Every structure is written in structure tokens, then in C-alpha cells.
Regions:
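C-terminus-biased signal that marks the final domain/tail of proteins
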Residues: 1-210
């Protein structure tokens, strides 16, 4: 496989997010279609990846999206904007296929409480922490994947499209503010990033109850 490829057209940030969610769908190695997927077409294979049948060894391919993911992000750089405005990390926790990426401007001076170090841990559950909230929804989806994941996908696409639209307006406001007061622009973008991240986790917590 190549380390990188040059696309023949501009790639949208939402498309790159979807690249992160691949399980080889639509190929001969589609993990939702082989016997290991079971009746609910689950595209995940629990470790170990290799197994033996009748003395012959086999191995599952590793998909891009996996269940043991801590976090992923898509980095977006817009050269036509001031550096403080032009850089965004679209950040998500847990399995990329089920996460929702939200925009964290690169100039942000703090992170949302739901994503902050010390708010829960790998051994300490709290429904105020983004990872645990997303992990609950994702683990539930694994049990009946072809019935539950489409619901996640619909919600995911709606939120990410909404955030992309928000960013267009925030960019304009931040650029205008940046020209007058750099510190105020950075605080404006930090507030937007933190409020968006915290609100997302509140939304996803409610979604788990759905």
C-alpha cells in the first residue's frame, strides 16, 4: 500500500472523516459480509487476529476503524486564513466509525471539560467524559450492528455537517475580530471549540438513551 496518494480533485473534510471509518466495505475483503460478521453483519474481529481451522492458519485483515481506538483526528489547514483561525483539528474519541468529529481550533487555550485529562480514566467511569459516553453507544452498537449502526451514522452525519456549516460562519467572525484584537479572537475560537465539544457529549449521552 502507498504511504500517501495525491487526489485528482479537492477532498472535502467530511470525506476524509469517512476514510477513517473504513472496514473495507465494497471490496472482496468487506468485513461485514464474511462468515465472521454473523447475523448482524458486524465488521469487527476481536483479538487475536489469527486463528486456526483444521490445522490451517488464517488471519483477519485489520480495518482502518477499530474497536480499540482511543482517539482520532482530521487535521485541516486553511492557508488563506490567519494561522490562529486556519488550523482545525476535527477531533473524536473511541471507534472512528461511531465517533462524531467536532472542530477544535488550533489556537485554543483550553479543551472542553468533557475531553479534559482527569475527567475519568481508563479505569474510572464517568458519564461526563467524552470517551465513556461514546464508548457506551459504540459498544451497544456492536451487539446488533446492522440494526443500530445506521442510526448512529444518521446522527453522526447530521452533526458533522452542522459543525462544518458553523465553522464557515465562525471563520468569518474570527478573521474580522483577529484583525482588531488577536487575543479576543483566540478567546472567541476557544469558547466555540469548548462549547461545541461539551454540547456534543451532552447530545451523545441523550442519544444513548434513545
Amino acid at each position: 500500500m502507498p504511504v500517501w496518494v495525491k487526489p485528482n480533485r479537492k477532498v472535502d473534510v467530511l470525506e476524509v472523516m469517512d476514510f477513517m471509518r473504513d472496514h473495507l466495505e465494497g471490496t472482496e475483503l468487506d468485513m461485514s459480509k464474511d462468515p465472521g460478521a454473523g447475523p448482524y453483519e458486524c465488521p469487527y474481529r476481536w483479538r487475536p487476529m489469527s486463528f486456526e481451522v483444521d490445522g490451517k492458519e488464517y488471519v483477519h485483515e485489520r480495518a482502518t476503524a477499530t474497536q480499540q481506538t482511543g482517539f482520532t483526528f482530521v487535521s485541516q489547514s486553511r492557508s488563506w486564513l490567519p494561522d490562529a483561525v486556519g488550523g482545525i483539528l476535527w477531533f473524536g474519541v473511541d471507534d472512528a466509525a461511531s465517533t462524531v468529529y467536532f472542530p477544535m481550533y488550533s489556537c485554543s487555550t483550553r479543551v472542553p471539560h468533557a475531553y479534559a485529562v482527569g475527567n475519568g480514566s481508563m479505569m474510572e467511569f464517568t458519564d461526563q467524559a467524552a470517551f465513556w459516553v461514546f464508548n457506551q453507544v459504540t459498544n451497544f452498537a456492536y451487539t446488533r450492528y446492522n440494526a443500530i449502526h445506521p442510526e448512529i451514522r444518521e446522527k453522526q452525519k447530521a452533526l458533522e455537517s452542522q459543525y462544518k456549516t458553523f465553522v464557515e460562519g465562525i471563520d468569518s467572525g474570527a478573521k474580522a475580530l483577529f484583525d482588531k484584537d488577536r487575543a479576543a479572537a483566540i478567546e472567541f475560537l476557544t469558547d466555540f471549540s469548548c462549547n461545541t465539544g461539551n454540547h456534543l457529549v451532552d447530545t451523545w449521552r441523550d442519544f444513548y438513551g434513545y
